[in-house]
Regions:
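Elongated, amphipathic alpha-helical interaction scaffolds
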Residues: 1-202
């Protein structure tokens, strides 16, 4: 009898993880998983809106945030491609333009965050060569892509500091070590909010 492999639903785990990462600043942010961009089936993985414009987000992965923050997540099996960049960039332009009033959302109020497990070398080389964008490492697993109207960052989950970004950093297929799993379970223990409950994928 052939063994069936259980498929891990990575996106619900990501949606829970991204919210937990900002748990100390929830009052500043509004999370909208799978935010629909239009009546047609076009959606972004996560839209994070700053509740108060004058409050800065202190979390390391949110320091780049402005008012409207568009997040694209790739599962550990997936890769971030050049097409993905332009798709999400197009979504960001659409989100900025799809308003009641002209210029209701200013481009500088929109940021783009790409989250993936593998460093997208081909995509980065393309952006450097054809769009003259620059990339620099801001912190462990955090890269800023500069030179565009939209502030853009790239998060490589396996490179993130587990002390600062435990939940996103744990979105990997190789979380197998006994100590690591025990630590995650201990951290999870006693959390009864819905966001933590969704992380029972582990």
């Amino acid at each position: 009898m052939q063994e069936t492999t259980k498929r891990i639903e990575w996106h619900p785990a990501f949606q829970a993880s991204i919210q937990i990462e900002f748990e100390n600043e929830w009052e500043k942010l509004s999370f909208e998983p799978e935010h629909l961009l239009s009546k047609k089936p076009m959606q972004i993985d996560e839209l994070i809106i700053k509740v108060k414009d004058n409050e800065k987000v202190q979390k390391n992965i949110g320091k780049i945030f402005r008012k409207y923050n568009i997040i694209e997540y790739k599962s550990p099996d997936d890769y971030l491609t050049i097409n993905d960049f332009y798709k999400v960039y197009g979504y960001s332009c659409f989100y900025q333009a799809d308003t009641e009033n002209v210029f209701e959302i200013q481009p500088q109020e929109v940021t783009i965050t790409f989250i993936c497990n593998h460093y997208p070398r081909t995509m980065i080389q393309h952006l450097q060569k054809y769009r003259d964008l620059k990339i620099h490492k801001e912190g462990a697993g955090i890269y800023y892509i500069t030179g565009d109207e939209f502030p853009i960052q790239l998060l490589i989950t396996k490179e993130l500091n587990p002390e600062e970004n435990l939940w996103l950093q744990s979105l990997r297929k190789d979380v197998k070590g006994k100590r690591e799993i025990e630590f995650l379970l201990k951290t999870y223990e006693g959390k009864n909010i819905q966001t933590y409950i969704r992380l029972q994928w582990m």
